[in-house]
């Protein structure tokens, strides 16, 4: 099974001045990669469009699916984020398969606002997912309630399960996974020790069992800072767990 790479893997390189395009180019030739997820906050506004166009072409050339992490919340006091339309247009332009937002806080919405959101999501070919956050909006009970509400409102939203974010709100990923498993459409993988991200196998997460419990159609993204020399080993560990 192929593995996805979130560009959080290249945090050190990006902080040192590398572009996400530069980093992703290093994956060319790695047949075990099936998807790439770029991060909105890693782009420079002045070069974003040019870089994203090049990344999109690179993904097509290598038969990788392209995902995009939006550094914003989908839900808030005014209903849903007004950036959704703009980001869906961006996704269409650059052939982005999926947009990921943080959940935010679901508030009461008028029927017309709900209908507008539903139509916006249904009219797009791009999948939109919400993710559990490392704050009060990411508490298991809150996420469970939000996902049930999304289901009741017939909103075609997916759910990105982040296995690391639970630790930063003093919860555990394993019971959360058991509760939310049926809603998971994308999986963000990281291992945590003492609320710090570590290499796979060095933390407290039973990540192998979580991966084995996922349907084999669920995209799995490695999403933590990794020294470049350690990336092949980390990818191999994920593949081994999935084999």
Q: What residue spans do the PLM features occupy?
A:
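Flexible, active-site-proximal loop/turn residues at the rims of small-molecule/cofactor binding pockets
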Residues: 42, 105, 134, 193, ...
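A generic structural signal for short
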Residues: 12-13, 43-44, 75-76, 106, ...
């Amino acid at each position: 099974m192929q593995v996805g790479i979130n560009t959080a893997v290249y945090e050190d390189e990006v902080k040192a001045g590398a572009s996400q395009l530069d980093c992703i180019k290093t994956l060319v030739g790695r047949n075990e990669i099936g998807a790439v997820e770029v991060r909105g906050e890693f782009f420079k506004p002045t070069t974003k469009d040019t870089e994203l166009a090049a990344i999109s072409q690179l993904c097509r050339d290598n038969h990788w699916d392209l995902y995009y992490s939006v550094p914003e919340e989908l839900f808030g006091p005014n209903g849903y984020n007004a950036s959704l339309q703009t980001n869906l247009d961006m996704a269409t332009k650059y052939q982005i398969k999926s947009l990921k937002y943080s959940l935010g806080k679901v508030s009461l919405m008028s029927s017309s606002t709900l209908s507008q959101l539903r139509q916006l999501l249904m009219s797009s070919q791009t999948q939109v997912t919400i993710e559990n956050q490392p704050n009060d909006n990411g508490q298991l009970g809150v996420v469970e309630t939000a996902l049930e509400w999304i289901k009741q409102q017939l909103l075609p939203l997916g759910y990105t399960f982040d296995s690391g974010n639970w630790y930063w709100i003093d919860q555990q990923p394993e019971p959360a996974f058991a509760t939310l498993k049926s809603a998971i459409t994308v999986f963000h993988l990281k291992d945590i020790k003492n609320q710090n991200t570590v290499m796979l196998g060095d933390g407290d997460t039973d990540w192998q069992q979580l991966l084995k419990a996922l349907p084999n159609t669920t995209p799995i993204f490695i999403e933590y800072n990794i020294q470049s020399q350690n990336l092949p080993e980390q990818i191999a560990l994920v593949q081994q767990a999935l084999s």
